[in-house]
Amino acid sequence: MLRTKHLLTFLLLFSSLFAWSQKKTATVSGKVVDENDQPLARVSVIMLGKQSGITTSDSGRFTFKVPADKAFALVFSYAGYKTVQRNFFLSENEEETIIIRLDKGTRTLDEVVVTTQPERTEMGLIRINPKNALIIPSTIGGIESLIKIFVGSNNELTSQYSVRGGNYDENLIYVNDFEVFRPYLVRSGQQEGLSFINPELTGRVSFYNGGFQSRYGDKMSSALDIQYKKPKKFGGSAYLSLLEQGFHVEGTGAKDKFTYLVGLRQRTNRNLLSSQETTGSYIPSSTDIQAQFTWQFNPKWQLEALTNFARTSFTLVPEFSQLTTSVFSPLFSANIGVDIFFEGKEKDRYATNMVGLAATQQVNKNLRLKWMFSRFENDESENYDIIGAYLFGERDFDRSKPTFGEIVNPLGAGLYQQFARNQLNIVNWAAAHKGQLIKQKQVMQWGLTLEKTLINDQLNEWERQDSAGYTLPYLPGRLSLSKVIKSTADLDINKISGYIQDNIVFNDSLGITLQAGLRFNYNALNQELLLSPRLQFSWMPRSKKDLVFKAAAGAYHQPPFYRELRRLDGTVNTALLAQRSWQVVAGMDYQFKVGNRPFRLSTEAYYKQMTNVVPYDIDNVRIRYFGENNAKAYATGVEMRLVGEWVKDAESWLSIGFMRTRENLDDDFYYNFYNKDGELITGQTEDQVVADSARVDVGWLRRPTDRLFTMGLFFQDYLSTNKNFKVHLNLLFGSNMPYNIPGSVKYRNALIIDPYIRADLGFSALLLDNEKGNRRSHSPFRNLENIWASLEIFNLLDRRNTISFLLIKDYSNTTFAVPNRLTPRLLNIKLLARF
């Protein structure tokens, strides 16, 4: 009997242990952020009713093993923030990924509002941490340097970017829902000043590289949505580098009903430009001040003001330029060089002023209304009168000879003069209303915008070329100019646009979301009405929540603005119609873990069909449009993005893209001429007498932004023994691009710019941490939160990439293309302090 009792006890104990070992589990993982979407480290995560738990990592991430097939709750708490709770019921082996936002305060155990993950379900959306804009090694810095990781680049001196075969004018930029604009007369990256977006003021960055919603405007390529921070306490920062200096302060007042956010920046690219191939006196300068103020009158009403005042000037007194390239052909192989001696000066000025006011009414917890009014002004002037005398020929690269570096076999000589006195003033007035209504699993959004744009410009620009004593083009008895643009314009453009959009989340078991919307735009200048339906769809399988499938389709039409309206001769085409495009995008988003570190892989395939296209040429960053709707085009490609912690607690990004974009111009043809022997007449043909001709239609050809392959990498690492010493790598690669020979139908976009390859490396070290309690009361650093020092190596590979070509003719009228190159390897140091 006793043995039987012992046996039963043993069996019960064994079965209990076996049952325990077979306990069903699931996984909850995610990220905890503050009200500005910045990650919070060391947040306590505890299962309700338990005594122990885990804490979030330095990147705010956590992973928690939880029981399956039963209800439970996780409690998130952090000093100075409201404690919140999230309830779950998960199936066995199910993985739930969430984002938790904590608000400052002392109230405890609120039912948390869990933010959705729109970057997974919305097509084309890339969420970017603005803090990385302060650490990424880049000559331009700022938010745009982060965007270039995903879309590629071919110019480290500009903050402009091209998305999926579009040009710089096809990108929307919003700051706090106000649309902002860039200067229009800028011809090269070295003339650019500060970007409008101040990363120190930025709280959230949402970048759409295609297929964006109806609530965004009428352009064909991308939308960048910037939301500035909402300060909760007093703080600020100051930084100093060889390129840029800045200061910002933020805080609250009137019992937290009033907030302020003010930033001041100053930038000079002199250190970058001093190493250019053209030597001389460079005096670039750019300064801006921005401020955001909010007043919370009561729980229902808030008033917001956003202002920006920016001034950029660029002065150049060129002296000498030495360009070199190699020519390989069956007829001729040599190192070709051009020596240019300059006389003259360039002085440009760009001023931007912006004021925006917004009143927001929270009618109830489900209905929010917003009224906005803004004024944006660009005032620009471009003045230069430069004469260049050049000698062109074979350059000696034999270091043993006294003629090393000199042109020893001249092929041509001449003189050219470039002159411009251009003035432009654009004022854009806008009044808008936006609304949002939450109704169960639906979010209705609508908006209406009235715009009035006043454009006044005076263009006086010409170029003269002289070769071997003859002015080109050569007309006996006449002095002719190779290029003349002389025009004035005084335009008053009125536009009205609006949208309505419904966002639907179906039953959780289906995992389906749907966004359907319609935009309209009426332009009084050409009396054109545009209707743009747009649709997005996503599906997250219930059994596999780490995978999301999504698709989007819609119309993305772009009404003409200042640059599109101007023809190549400077005249204005006010009857120009909008460029129209229909786009289809499909993709997937997959979350997974490698070594318990989170990763996310996003893949998208797209196709854009464009009609009423206005062809253009790009020279550096200057876009010259034909001013006519005389082409059709398409762009298609695949993009892949991998975001994850390749090194624990240090997020890195890898982006790869394949793309093709082509255009077909109306009536683009040329003639081949043949002599009596049937030989095609070229510059080397002996018999130049035309006996016959044949028409050749050009057909489809590469667009100026065509680039087959792009790759971007932003990688972060740190010392395993000390996370306060970090390294950051910014790597960009882009395959070759076409370049146009002006005035040539046969050789349109026929020149090839070599692949763009660039690596920037940065090292940063924490000089002072945020443990203020360890500092002495009389320490001059007692009020500082931290101090970081950085060393940056720009263009680590010392590869001088090509941005454009200088076209020169020799004595036999043969044209040679000599590349204009960008910056070499340079160093930069930076000091950043926060308080």
Task: Tell where the protein language model's regions lie, with residue ranges.
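Membrane-embedded beta-barrel scaffold of Gram-negative outer-membrane proteins
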Residues: 370-374, 578-651, 657, 663, ...
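Short, acidic, small-residue-rich periplasmic hinge/interaction motif at the N-terminus
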Residues: 31-38, 44-48, 75-82, 91-135, ...
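C-terminal beta-signal and adjacent terminal beta-strands/loops
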Residues: 732-742, 765-835
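Face-selective signature of the C-terminal outer-membrane beta-barrel domain
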Residues: 296-311, 344-526, 602, 653
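Transmembrane beta-barrel wall of Gram-negative outer-membrane proteins
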Residues: 237, 243-266, 279-319, 346-371
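Surface-exposed extracellular loop regions of Gram-negative outer-membrane beta-barrel proteins
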Residues: 529, 542-585, 605-630, 730-744, ...
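Gram-negative outer-membrane beta-barrel transporters
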Residues: 507-509, 607-609, 629-740, 832
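Periplasmic N-terminal accessory/gating domains of Gram-negative outer-membrane beta-barrel systems
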Residues: 82, 91-92, 96, 118-212, ...
